[in-house]
Amino acid sequence: MTHEEILTLLGDYVDYLIANSSAEAPMWNIEKVRSGKPNKWNYIDGCMITACLSLYKTTGDEKYLSFSKDFIDFFVQEDGSIKTYDPKEYNLDNVNQGKNLFTLYDIFGDEKYRRAIDTIRSQLLTQPRTKEGNFWHKDIYPWQVWLDGTYMAQPFYMEYETRFNKMQGCIDSYKQFMNIKKHMRDEKTGLYYHGYDESRQMYWADPVTGCSPNFWLRAMGWFMVAMVDVLERMDEQLYNEYRGIMAQLRQTIEDVHKFQDEETGMFWQVMDHPGVEGNYLETSGTALFAYAVLKGVRLGYLPKRMAAWAEKAFYGTCDQYLSQNPDGSLQLGGICLVAGLGGKDHRDGSLAYYFSEPVVCNDAKGVGPLLLAYAEILAAQKQ
């Protein structure tokens, strides 16, 4: 397919997903579909609605906005409470969807969104932390920091503190990124480990470093996007902190790029083991790289030369995994459904573990990032 054909196909693909989804039954939330349980406030839908709102900002097409508003309004009540959301669960994943409330509040001015923003902020006020001050990923994972959590919570936290709290928590957010760099970055590759256990008690944690054993692509992807999204929400008056995260972003993109597959432009599920039996070129993490770089270039955080790396990743993913079914419907494949550490399934962070998780089509953990990158491609064409 030509690049133009891919972009046209993606426009049709979003229409297809929206037409077949609602807040009660989002077709892109494969975990929910498989569970058969009612939908609840979650980060997966949050990622998809963020993409829809980004497409609205880029194209001005009201269908993306009206769908997003209806979706969020299913959960957000007039008093600012959020159906199915419990702040005391202390799960950073649940903060992610909160980013979309800022956008809807700015567009519609409805105070229920402002109240709901405060509801989510209340979680972070008492979210348990490591001794060094990083949010625990979840209350059920004590003393643990996961890369995923930076994307889930830090952009919301930075925006709230910048807009509504006189920047009081902004340096706290910055310090959490610096702690992650200190503990989770591998000096040899420049890649970051998926998880870190400050207590060194978990079976997956290295007894010396506290880190999990491998570099999972999507975790790296969430982390790269987190830095871009935090910079976007950060006041440049925080001169040293702003430049500190920008330098961390640039170095990370340079280091990650070294692992880009030359032929396809994609990245491997476990990044530093290309071609190993069981490993595969994975959609979601590749799309997150493309989005982080394209947005970083547009906003001036990254040099323009990096855009070519992102475009190669974006179009390479579409060539590899975007296809039409015989009935004309579209699908995006190559998406790792889920990966974590610990828990009841004894997830040990080994290569065998990361290779064993299901690979699915049309899940928002891959679709959302690809559509965010698509919105950036469209925005770049307008400039």
Question: What function would you assign to each model-found segment?
Answer:
Residues 51, 58, 100, 107, ...:
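Core register positions within helices of long alpha-helical scaffolds
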Residues 6-26, 66-83, 115-134, 167-196, ...:
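Long, well-ordered core segments of solenoidal/helical folds
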Residues 2-44, 63-65, 74-92, 96-98, ...:
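CBM-like carbohydrate-recognition segments
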Residues 59, 108, 160-171, 230-243, ...:
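Inter-helical turn/loop segments and adjacent helix faces that build the functional surface
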Residues 87, 92-154:
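Extracytoplasmic mature domains of secreted/periplasmic and thylakoid-lumen proteins
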Residues 224-274, 278:
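Oxyanion-binding "anion nests"
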Residues 145-152, 165, 169-172, 207-223, ...:
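Short, contiguous, pocket-lining structural segments
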Residues 76-83, 134-139, 199-213, 268-278, ...:
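Acidic/His metal-coordination segments adjacent to aromatic residues that form catalytic metal sites
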